[in-house]
């Protein structure tokens, strides 16, 4: 007597070939960009080891008792160590911001698989060279700044490439919700990077860079062998873009629900799939100026500049603010600061889901930004009154600050890169993503730098700066919000990408 078919096999049979490939692409790109963030994190962990409080340690026999810097790593042992360590952050962030504007242009013109895998391998090499400085006993500041600059440039290959790949495989149906979940790779990478770097920092801080460097390089090799750039390359059905969806609506006498899950593709017969696999014509790349002319690109780019300024100021300064203002020890402050990342994951999913349901990404971002300003004010004055208040406020601030940031850098970028004004004759995903994220990276470089200057006068000034940046981000979306409100009043479910 035969048993029934195994449950797992029945499940496998119920999943279409297209869905399997799409799920594989989601997991792959998630892991790839997790590696990018994983390899960025070590510098923030190692800083405490480069300059230490040597007075708390017993002096070796050959070290004078008056030498209070013997355990620090030159040239970071002097009183200006904060400026020197800050220069490492600035070197990375500025080179990343500049390189991002060119990364998209190269990404559109080079094979995506080669571009992403090569960038990951090169980034792994440059990250490892930071760690080699420990074993080679290098104490020259220029060495570390040089490889921070080179690594910043190499890291620009990641974001445009993974967003382009996601955009190639998935239509607009539930892109915001799926990408909101997918965008949690940032927090996952930060957490893993902290754990891996922290495991070696006290014994041999060089490994805090070398191990993450090996990991991202290894995944770069995996990317080279397994990444599929377009669904047509493996005979899968490509996602419908706006113009194609309109054509189908005109010719098929049945209702079409644009919010159907992105994993369900239009049925195609074997001959169509075979033909698509045999002969794939990919569209022509778009110019930098051409990408700027796409409606919404400039507004969302400038909005992200200020939104990312707020987000990265929290990223670099939140642990110190918690330690100073709430009198937590550094470890507890660091643990509490991760709640901001947890809120960011929730905010990204929430913003993406609302955007999918309403089709109004500009309004979604603006509402969250409007709520952010008073919440920052409240957190500054009342957020440290108790541990429960601190936890709640950190999660809420993470939701409101990182929600718009996540939505703009993922679903909005992908939507604009497949805008209907392109009429199918140009691809712009990588270039648009690079322009938007590059603009945001300018804010990411400015925010922590300004916070360092203003914090010496008091933390209130830092929060005033963050509130002002948040208001600017709101105002920059005013035109798109106005158009979306008009479309709502007209009874249309029309987003900025169709204006």
From Swiss-Prot:
InterPro entries found in the cross-reference section: MFS, MFS_dom, MFS_trans_sf, SLC37A1_2, Sugar_P_transporter
Cellular compartment(s): Endoplasmic reticulum membrane
CDD domains recorded: MFS_SLC37A1_2 (cd17344)
Glycosylated residue positions: 53, 62, 66
Superkingdom, taxonomy of origin: Eukaryota
KW Cell division (keyword) present: no
Alphabetized UniProt keyword annotations: Antiport, Endoplasmic reticulum, Glycoprotein, Membrane, Sugar transport, Transmembrane, Transmembrane helix, Transport
Bilayer disposition of the protein: Multi-pass membrane protein
Keyword Transferase: no
Function, as annotated: Inorganic phosphate and glucose-6-phosphate antiporter. May transport cytoplasmic glucose-6-phosphate into the lumen of the endoplasmic reticulum and translocate inorganic phosphate into the opposite direction.
Similarity section: Belongs to the major facilitator superfamily. Organophosphate:Pi antiporter (OPA) (TC 2.A.1.4) family.
Protein name (database record): Glucose-6-phosphate exchanger SLC37A2
């Amino acid at each position: 007597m035969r048993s029934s078919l195994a449950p797992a096999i029945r499940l496998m049979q119920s999943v279409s070939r297209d869905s399997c490939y799409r799920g594989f692409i989601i997991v792959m790109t998630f892991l790839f960009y997790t590696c990018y963030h994983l390899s960025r994190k070590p510098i923030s962990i190692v800083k405490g080891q480069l300059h230490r409080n040597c007075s708390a340690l017993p002096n070796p026999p050959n070290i004078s008792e008056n030498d209070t810097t013997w355990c620090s790593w030159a040239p970071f042992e002097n009183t200006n160590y904060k400026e020197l360590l800050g220069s490492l952050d600035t070197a990375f962030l500025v080179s990343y911001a500049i390189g991002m504007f060119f990364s998209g242009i190269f990404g559109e013109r080079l094979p995506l698989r080669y571009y992403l895998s090569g960038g990951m391998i090169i980034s792994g090499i440059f990250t490892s060279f930071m760690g080699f400085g420990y074993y080679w006993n290098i104490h020259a500041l220029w060495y570390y700044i040089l490889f921070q600059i080179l690594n910043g440039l190499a890291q620009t290959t990641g974001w445009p490439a993974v967003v382009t790949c996601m955009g190639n495989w998935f239509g607009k149906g539930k892109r915001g919700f799926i990408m909101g979940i997918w965008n949690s790779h940032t927090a996952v990478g930060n957490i893993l990077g902290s754990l891996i770097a922290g495991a070696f920092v006290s014994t041999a801080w060089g490994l805090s860079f070398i191990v993450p460097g090996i990991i991202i390089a290894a995944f770069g090799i995996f990317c080279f062998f397994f990444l599929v750039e377009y669904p047509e390359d493996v005979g899968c059905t490509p996602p419908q873009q706006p113009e194609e969806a309109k054509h189908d609506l005109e010719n098929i006498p049945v209702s079409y629900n644009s919010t159907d899950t992105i994993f369900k593709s239009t049925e195609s017969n074997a001959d169509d799939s075979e033909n698509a696999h045999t002969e794939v014509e990919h569209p022509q790349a778009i110019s930098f100026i051409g990408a700027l002319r796409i409606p919404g690109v400039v507004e969302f780019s400038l909005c992200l500049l200020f939104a990312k300024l707020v987000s990265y100021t929290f990223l670099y300064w939140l642990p110190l603010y918690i330690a100073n203002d709430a009198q937590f020890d550094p470890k507890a402050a660091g643990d509490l600061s991760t709640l901001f990342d947890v809120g960011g994951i929730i905010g990204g999913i929430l913003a993406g889901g609302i955007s999918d349901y309403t089709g109004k990404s500009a309004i979604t971002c603006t509402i969250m930004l409007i709520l952010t300003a008073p919440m920052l004010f409240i957190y500054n004055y009342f957020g440290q009154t108790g541990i429960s208040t601190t936890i709640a406020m950190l999660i809420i601030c993470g939701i409101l600050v990182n929600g718009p940031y996540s939505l703009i850098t993922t679903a909005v970028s992908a939507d604009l890169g497949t805008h209907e004004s392109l009429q199918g004759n140009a691809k712009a995903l990588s270039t648009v993503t690079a322009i938007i994220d590059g603009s945001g990276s300018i804010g990411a470089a400015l925010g922590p730098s300004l916070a360092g200057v203003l914090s010496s006068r008091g933390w209130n000034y830092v929060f005033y700066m963050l509130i002002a940046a948040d208001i600017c981000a709101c105002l920059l979306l005013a035109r798109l919000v106005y158009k979306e409100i008009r479309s709502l009043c007209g009874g249309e479910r029309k987003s900025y990408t169709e204006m």
